[in-house]
């Protein structure tokens, strides 16, 4: 059920932050329509089990948000690590990569708060595709996009 999931971490660390385009933290639970911002996901291999191969990062975004496809929009000011392969869909981004022992990678997705309303933002998940003991999940939350001028 939406809003009842819990964070879980097994042999992998996962931190999700939302920031303005200038890199300042932003509260995504209450955004003004038209706001551009980014999701920043940092994944760390604690190093105990060596190199992790074939990790899959799944990010599904709230229905009221739109993904700004940096490749199509010719945007290059949101710098982050580059995955081995990335699949960008209407409401989600799948990133696939390897992660060395003790290594950290940060992936960034540019977003826009497009449609007024309250939406559920699903949790972010990262896992090894062929080893179910390597997984991390950060819970989702409810978010609201308000008309311009409604947020004081």
Where are these regions (language model features)?
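Long, domain-scale non-catalytic interaction/scaffolding regions in large secretory-pathway
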Residues: 1-152
């Amino acid at each position: 059920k939406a809003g009842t999931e819990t964070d879980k971490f097994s042999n992998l660390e996962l931190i999700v932050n939302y920031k303005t385009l200038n890199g300042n933290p932003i509260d995504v639970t209450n955004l003004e329509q038209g706001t551009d911002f980014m999701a920043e996901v940092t994944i760390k291999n604690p190093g105990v089990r060596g190199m992790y191969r074939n990790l899959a990062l799944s990010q599904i975004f709230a229905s009221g948000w739109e993904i700004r496809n940096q490749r199509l929009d010719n945007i290059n000011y949101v710098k982050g690590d580059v995955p081995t392969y990335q699949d960008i869909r209407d409401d989600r981004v799948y990133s696939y990569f390897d992660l060395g022992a003790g290594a950290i990678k940060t992936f960034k997705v540019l977003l826009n708060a497009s449609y007024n309303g309250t939406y559920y933002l699903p949790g972010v998940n990262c896992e090894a595709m062929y080893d179910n003991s390597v997984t991390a999940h950060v819970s989702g939350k409810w978010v609201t996009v308000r008309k311009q001028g409604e947020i004081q």
